[in-house]
A protein has these predicted regions:
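Active-site loop of short-chain dehydrogenase/reductase
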Residues: 3, 74-75, 120-134
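Conserved glycine-rich cofactor-binding loop
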Residues: 11-12
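Conserved glycine-rich Rossmann-like NAD(P)H-binding loop of the short-chain dehydrogenase/reductase
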Residues: 27-39
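Rossmann-fold cofactor-recognition segment
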Residues: 46-59
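Conserved NAD(P)H cofactor-binding loop of Rossmann-fold oxidoreductase domains
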Residues: 81-87
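Substrate-binding pocket helix/loop in short-chain dehydrogenase/reductase
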Residues: 89-90, 94-102
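A short, exposed helix-loop element centered on a Lys and neighboring polar residues
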Residues: 113-114
């Protein structure tokens, strides 16, 4: 059986590199992002599927996993990589922008991990959830 990976928050940096590595190892790759148009070149390069998803929206995350179930079943690996860089001193940060960054990084990560765990634990897979706070 072919192993599979779902990469949420896919883009042109780290997640693209991880997608290439996974594809080179023979894994089936699904890329998820708010803007899937930006993923078209990578999609073609690694023969991936793409799904539009806002990781901070419960309905969008639920839809992502229902679509993923149809494409690859329960993924063997889920990578959560969305981020929002804040930059600057904590003294000068706009609290609304900080909230958005934490919402994307932590709450979105929780929503994805929860849906992934519901599927992956049925297959005795390990689930590791490590939210990383935005860089300040």
């Amino acid at each position: 059986m072919t192993e599979s990976v779902l990469i949420v928050g896919a883009g042109s940096g780290l997640s693209a590199s991880l997608g290439r590595v996974c594809a080179s190892k023979g894994m089936r790759v699904v890329l998820a992002a708010r803007n899937i148009e930006k993923l078209q070149n990578l999609k073609k390069e690694i023969d991936a599927d793409t799904i539009k998803c806002d990781a901070t929206n419960i309905k969008s995350v639920s839809s992502l996993f229902k679509k993923t179930d149809k494409i690859i079943g329960a993924p063997n690996l889920v990578i959560y990589n969305p981020s929002k860089s804040l930059g600057g001193s904590i003294v000068d940060l706009d609290p609304k922008k900080a909230y958005e960054a934490i919402n994307i990084t932590c709450y979105g990560g929780f929503l994805i991990a929860q849906q992934a765990a519901k599927r992956m634990l049925k297959n005795n897979a390990e689930v590791f959830f490590l939210p990383v706070l935005p860089q300040v």
